[in-house]
Amino acid sequence: MAGELVSFAVNKLWDLLSHEYTLFQGVEDQVAELKSDLNLLKSFLKDADAKKHTSALVRYCVEEIKDIVYDAEDVLETFVQKEKLGTTSGIRKHIKRLTCIVPDRREIALYIGHVSKRITRVIRDMQSFGVQQMIVDDYMHPLRNREREIRRTFPKDNESGFVALEENVKKLVGYFVEEDNYQVVSITGMGGLGKTTLARQVFNHDMVTKKFDKLAWVSVSQDFTLKNVWQNILGDLKPKEEETKEEEKKILEMTEYTLQRELYQLLEMSKSLIVLDDIWKKEDWEVIKPIFPPTKGWKLLLTSRNESIVAPTNTKYFNFKPECLKTDDSWKLFQRIAFPINDASEFEIDEEMEKLGEKMIEHCGGLPLAIKVLGGMLAEKYTSHDWRRLSENIGSHLVGGRTNFNDDNNNSCNYVLSLSFEELPSYLKHCFLYLAHFPEDYEIKVENLSYYWAAEEIFQPRHYDGEIIRDVGDVYIEELVRRNMVISERDVKTSRFETCHLHDMMREVCLLKAKEENFLQITSNPPSTANFQSTVTSRRLVYQYPTTLHVEKDINNPKLRSLVVVTLGSWNMAGSSFTRLELLRVLDLVQAKLKGGKLASCIGKLIHLRYLSLEYAEVTHIPYSLGNLKLLIYLNLHISLSSRSNFVPNVLMGMQELRYLALPSLIERKTKLELSNLVKLETLENFSTKNSSLEDLRGMVRLRTLTIELIEETSLETLAASIGGLKYLEKLEIDDLGSKMRTKEAGIVFDFVHLKRLRLELYMPRLSKEQHFPSHLTTLYLQHCRLEEDPMPILEKLLQLKELELGHKSFSGKKMVCSSCGFPQLQKLSISGLKEWEDWKVEESSMPLLLTLNIFDCRKLKQLPDEHLPSHLTAISLKKCGLEDPIPTLERLVHLKELSLSELCGRIMVCTGGGFPQLHKLDLSELDGLEEWIVEDGSMPRLHTLEIRRCLKLKKLPNGFPQLQNLHLTEVEEWEEGMIVKQGSMPLLHTLYIWHCPKLPGEQHFPSHLTTVFLLGMYVEEDPMRILEKLLHLKNVSLFQSFSGKRMVCSGGGFPQLQKLSIREIEWEEWIVEQGSMPLLHTLYIGVCPNLKELPDGLRFIYSLKNLIVSKRWKKRLSEGGEDYYKVQHIPSVEFDD
């Protein structure tokens, strides 16, 4: 395999010498001789690659060739850049600094001669070791030819890998839907067995999605961080409307304690299914599980190679162990992938190939992953001869008869997976090895990956009939997906592969091969020792999740070509001198905090750089020397918004190779950037007329993605003339922030036939006719358009539209009509800020696939369409509308699961029997006019979560809710005692959350089976413990600003099941805990209670207590030797919190 990678490098060097031949004037003879030597060298490499496994001497020769070729490429490419850029201001001085590498033309001639001699010597050595000369094909066919040759091995759906799993899925779904006895289910078995596939089928099963109102999927991995796992779970469980960048940032900034508290509360109040995929150790589960409350609303599915993850003594736990596929099922799976046909009559399997296939799948040991990879590999081989060769390779490796299902199964499967790598063409080997940069279970952005590949010239778009880098990257990912080596699916809105990742076992192969080839050096915590510096010999270096990186101290490898940081948060860049890294092609400093906010001017010395990313980095000043980087194809300056004022010099016009450019969102107004020369751009983000001229866009005819801010005064004619010729656009966003542009009566006409996503925030009183809209449009967002005519008759004819958002002031009319059969593909409709809209008519069969409807701040809308609101709606949010009583219309929607009503104006709300048959969650917020709510028997039979906020005139809850498990009440000051929870109602209620109620209900009005109670902002005068401690099943209590008295007592025998108690911001002075109170308490948190004189003496009798978190002011008293240490000395963990 190394031979093929070296052959790839040889071809790159050949290309350099051929394409830049005119620059080698004066050394033409030496160049011609070197090219001849390279041709001869290529003819030996294939046989050398085959023999390196059995000969250490041949292996040494291959490694020496790699060094020769890479060194030659570094020197000759620097020479080429010297010739190209030597006359550019600032470059001549820099090139002189490279005299140690490329001094002058005479010495370059001597160097080329030296390289030729080294090649001659290594060829002679290989011949003496028995390596033979062979005729080889070109290393890479043009993309178009390969596309014609590629056999389409997969159907459009992904059922090809779904063999013999139906019964397992059915059984597992039963544990989550029908069985209440099991709260935790694990799927365990060896890698590649299909555990994740099985879990995914359960996670997406219709019965499961109907059962739970919240779902979260988190990949844990071998080297996970607890904080990251909790962040991902919280991100999945948060309500959809909160999924903003601000919310994401808030979650990322949470401490572990805050995350644990948020998740604990969220899981107590919801019916959730959490999947933790790929847990490695029992200890990992032990540190994750504190977020799970003792209540029964949640369920957990684990996958692991370790059967002892959860203690089997837990009666709520069940372990499911799938078996390897039997021979017949193995053959069925293999056949679906290696011979993908819809009709058996279309294709007859060659008898010899069938026998060879049956023989080879024996080595897969019934592992689905190994079978799929083998099938994908053989699907690319067309002849019996190819199949025989692969069969012999497998057989020769597995000596000693290791072919039995149970005989060294892992070794057999690992070799099958390794062989799939060996069978890749050389360009795909490089692509695959690049995936070793990323941590386990990391979602890799395919767009970034494509530009990494292009920057290292793994592919060169100029070879492929004008294809853009993103297109070529998609083709390569598709080939790896087809071979079952990479996991990814095309996004339905963009038709592209947006993210990808590796199966665990394929990642092990990837890391192993990358290590064998010295392809990449991986480190997680950058050491600054000379010992580390001396060990970094790879030409690629990646830091995973660093906290600090000092370039000068941590990196000392002048041959380094790629430096990449992979992180989920910000990190400190202590030093940014790149003077020793002048051969870098790729530099990714995502989310770096640069010292002083300045990018060092020495960045301009990296003249080989093709990829530079400062995405979300904290930097305010970009140096003028950036203009030296003439070879950049990717430049991301979308820096952190915390950098309010950013200086970018006008040096970008010389970067004529740029394909991707993201500018800062905020640039100093005085800065003017000339961009007209960047005609090869494929993506341009954050273009602003404040800093650039619209006319610069005219020549960027290759653009696929364009986002524009119109700030300076402009005209529609200028805009149309500037972007009208960009016919390949797929995504366009135009935001008018003060251009005072006014459109003509006919609206804006864009002839973008490939456009899929369009966002317009500008004045546009008329829409173009539907024939002028791109026919492939899938996503449309309109805002501030002030459309005078109903937009629906035009928009509903966009046959591919899946998401439509009519934002603030997008329509100024009164009536909208959605016609019969209109919007045939629409799945999500959002309407907000339409001040004059008052009438909405929906005809039968309109929007037949609509799932989500959001209407916000449309105060004149009095009612919803009575008859033909799409019946498949599953989620509806209505806020700040003039609707008086939408319930009669909504309760007929038989698939509705989530309903949120906020700031409506009705006085009475009646839910009739049989209505809302599938509703799981109901949120009523700020219904100021609501005085009475009636729920008839049989209404909302599946409702398990009810949230009521600031419904000030509503005095009590209605009867009913037989399945309700979570009740959340906020600001119910006027409710009568006893009306919060009526005795005998809500028999399954286990979580109660009350905020701002001046009086605590009597104990007879609390359901006796409550397990969780949160009291917030109540300031009740009487001791709440007197009532709460009598709730025999209570396991979690949280009191926040909920007691205004001075003394609280927990009586002996009280709180018999309590496990967690949290008390914050209470003015109490004395707390007494009698012996025998809270005998099962394991976690106690006391925060910001400044008047509490001392912790109760009774804590020393709570032997179950494992975790105590208190204010730092208690540290002296509770530490060893302190006066109250005796109260807490038995507690394993005592933390002092701010």
Swiss-Prot record:
<feature type="repeat" description="LRR 6">
    <location>
        <begin position="681"/>
        <end position="705"/>
    </location>
</feature>
<feature type="repeat" description="LRR 4">
    <location>
        <begin position="607"/>
        <end position="631"/>
    </location>
</feature>
<feature type="repeat" description="LRR 10">
    <location>
        <begin position="775"/>
        <end position="797"/>
    </location>
</feature>
<feature type="repeat" description="LRR 14">
    <location>
        <begin position="894"/>
        <end position="918"/>
    </location>
</feature>
<keyword id="KW-0067">ATP-binding</keyword>
<dbReference type="InterPro" id="IPR027417">
    <property type="entry name" value="P-loop_NTPase"/>
</dbReference>
<feature type="binding site">
    <location>
        <begin position="189"/>
        <end position="196"/>
    </location>
    <ligand>
        <name>ATP</name>
    </ligand>
</feature>
<dbReference type="GO" id="GO:0005524">
    <property type="term" value="F:ATP binding"/>
</dbReference>
<feature type="domain" description="NB-ARC">
    <location>
        <begin position="166"/>
        <end position="422"/>
    </location>
</feature>
<feature type="repeat" description="LRR 3">
    <location>
        <begin position="582"/>
        <end position="606"/>
    </location>
</feature>
<dbReference type="InterPro" id="IPR036388">
    <property type="entry name" value="WH-like_DNA-bd_sf"/>
</dbReference>
<feature type="repeat" description="LRR 9">
    <location>
        <begin position="754"/>
        <end position="774"/>
    </location>
</feature>
<feature type="repeat" description="LRR 18">
    <location>
        <begin position="1079"/>
        <end position="1103"/>
    </location>
</feature>
<dbReference type="InterPro" id="IPR002182">
    <property type="entry name" value="NB-ARC"/>
</dbReference>
<feature type="repeat" description="LRR 15">
    <location>
        <begin position="940"/>
        <end position="963"/>
    </location>
</feature>
<feature type="repeat" description="LRR 2">
    <location>
        <begin position="566"/>
        <end position="581"/>
    </location>
</feature>
<dbReference type="GO" id="GO:0002229">
    <property type="term" value="P:defense response to oomycetes"/>
</dbReference>
<dbReference type="InterPro" id="IPR042197">
    <property type="entry name" value="Apaf_helical"/>
</dbReference>
<keyword id="KW-0433">Leucine-rich repeat</keyword>
<comment type="similarity">
    <text>Belongs to the disease resistance NB-LRR family.</text>
</comment>
<feature type="repeat" description="LRR 17">
    <location>
        <begin position="1055"/>
        <end position="1078"/>
    </location>
</feature>
<feature type="repeat" description="LRR 8">
    <location>
        <begin position="727"/>
        <end position="752"/>
    </location>
</feature>
<dbReference type="GO" id="GO:0043531">
    <property type="term" value="F:ADP binding"/>
</dbReference>
<feature type="repeat" description="LRR 16">
    <location>
        <begin position="1028"/>
        <end position="1050"/>
    </location>
</feature>
<feature type="repeat" description="LRR 12">
    <location>
        <begin position="847"/>
        <end position="871"/>
    </location>
</feature>
<dbReference type="Pfam" id="PF23559">
    <property type="entry name" value="WH_DRP"/>
</dbReference>
<dbReference type="Pfam" id="PF18052">
    <property type="entry name" value="Rx_N"/>
</dbReference>
<dbReference type="InterPro" id="IPR055414">
    <property type="entry name" value="LRR_R13L4/SHOC2-like"/>
</dbReference>
<keyword id="KW-0677">Repeat</keyword>
<protein>
    <recommendedName>
        <fullName>Protein RECOGNITION OF PERONOSPORA PARASITICA 7</fullName>
    </recommendedName>
</protein>
<feature type="repeat" description="LRR 7">
    <location>
        <begin position="707"/>
        <end position="726"/>
    </location>
</feature>
<keyword id="KW-0611">Plant defense</keyword>
<feature type="repeat" description="LRR 5">
    <location>
        <begin position="655"/>
        <end position="680"/>
    </location>
</feature>
<keyword id="KW-0547">Nucleotide-binding</keyword>
<feature type="repeat" description="LRR 13">
    <location>
        <begin position="873"/>
        <end position="893"/>
    </location>
</feature>
<dbReference type="InterPro" id="IPR041118">
    <property type="entry name" value="Rx_N"/>
</dbReference>
<feature type="repeat" description="LRR 19">
    <location>
        <begin position="1115"/>
        <end position="1138"/>
    </location>
</feature>
<feature type="repeat" description="LRR 1">
    <location>
        <begin position="544"/>
        <end position="565"/>
    </location>
</feature>
<dbReference type="InterPro" id="IPR038005">
    <property type="entry name" value="RX-like_CC"/>
</dbReference>
<comment type="function">
    <text>Disease resistance protein required for incompatible interactions with avirulent strains of Hyaloperonospora arabidopsidis (downy mildew), isolate Hpa-Hiks1 in cv. Columbia.</text>
</comment>
<feature type="repeat" description="LRR 11">
    <location>
        <begin position="798"/>
        <end position="825"/>
    </location>
</feature>
<dbReference type="Pfam" id="PF00931">
    <property type="entry name" value="NB-ARC"/>
</dbReference>
